[in-house]
Amino acid sequence: MTALARRAATVALVAALTACSGTATTPETSKAPSNLPPPLVPAMALPDNAVDNAVAKLDGIADELMKSSGIPGMAVAVVHGGKTIYAKGFGIKDVNRPADDPANKVDPGTVFQLASVSKPIGATVVAHQVGQKAISWNTPVVDKLPWFALSDPAVTPMVAVGDLYSHRSGLPDHAGDKLEDLGYDRRYILERLRQLPLDPFRISYAYTNFGLTAAAEAVAAAAGKPWEDLSEQVLYHPLGMTSTSSRFADFEARPDKALGHIRIDGKYQPLYKRDPDPEAPAGGVSSSVDDLTHWLAMVLANGSYNGQQIVAPDALLPALTPQIVSSPASEPAMRSGFYGFGFNVGTTSAARTQLSHSGAFELGAGTNFVIIPSADVAIVALTNATPSGIPETLTAEFADLVQFGEVREDWRKLYGDAFADMDKPEGSLVGQKPPASPAPAKPPAAYVGTYRNDYWGAATVAEKDGKLSVALGPRPDIFELTHWDGDVFTFSFVTENAPPGTISTARFDGDKLTLEYFDDDKMGTFTR
């Protein structure tokens, strides 16, 4: 299984786990009739002082998770009844700075990269535009982006904004992500989605950053301005989210920001910068928990904030309700998980609708929020470390405490196991020893040249001092080649989608070069 496939499976499992809060037997509820319609009645009442009691335990939960995981920093906030009732920072922003430096402490105003928590935030930008009649969830993307296409000419004119915001276009999991790793820009990547095979339209769920980004670009085109400006104008500014942006440069310029830390050999280090500008609508938002409480309060209030209607309720509702099954049940008694437009939508064992989303940057961000509308409560947790399930564990334990008065699952193990699979290195030679007596390679000159590929661009093989390298992408990225056996070489690297320890083969065959890591969908062969 490739890293992208593992990531897709992890995303689905995390969403399913989030929707399965609590499985123990629940006490019998009152038989008094309710004035609410049956679909609005939960299976059990909340415990007395449910939210306050849950909040009282957050310090201990957060401290224990920080200590046991070793992650550098985390910030947590809770919204209830339209107010922020908890906001606190834990740990530090940068392990290379003194831990006792007050300026290095995480606080509620510290800005983190949100990764895929950007998706539901962006969905509320789209919902605003839908409410303004500037666009519809059903608007075909090609109506606003005439250059956009998918590989099936029958699907291209039909695929709508909502299809891409619910991951039901048929595009493969994480389509285009590796192009981003190589440094290609948004337009280049979106134009190459047309080369990818499609699963059946509107009945296949596959999580895509650049599919969703295409939809956001259509919304921005309809508004006549860049997505980043539109988000600021219609959402961040009206909500008073002064530390929130969809531009990486703004995050870089923040004095109070948490650096991303990657885990290598069990230790966290701020070794890489993650610039998500090409997929800004899907993963490029940076914010603080202070700012995010404004957004959570708005979602809980059906689009209203401080007496101002930011998003029309009828435009927001489709985003918060099921649009496709994302985690099918494996047996009749099991609850399925769903995806709305940018939101995970599930039902807990207390029969309460739960909205959520996680964000995950391998290079150093793990984020999560949970909203329980019927309890009028939401929680968000942001971390500056390779995803390991810590924010999800905290929010799941809090959700259990709110609904049941106790934690009912070993969420740390469930989420830890799910994320551990995503962190495994990729490549068929991982863990293998080189051949004891490899077949000799040809002279370096036999391999040198420029090999071309319509999807990935050029791969330029060069020789220096008898050693070969391959250069890819517009920067370019240069990978040193190590001989393995005959015409097979290897290279190692770390990117957002290639965890530490990843090894790719580079296999030469005459005028053809196949790069294993880039051979998704059998598209990794370059021709000289």
Where are these regions (language model features)?
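Active-site helix/loop module of the DD-peptidase/beta-lactamase fold
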Residues: 57, 73, 102-104, 108, ...
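Catalytic nucleophile serine of serine hydrolases
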Residues: 116-117, 206-209
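Short, conserved catalytic-motif segment at the N-terminal edge
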Residues: 48-112, 131-136, 143, 151, ...
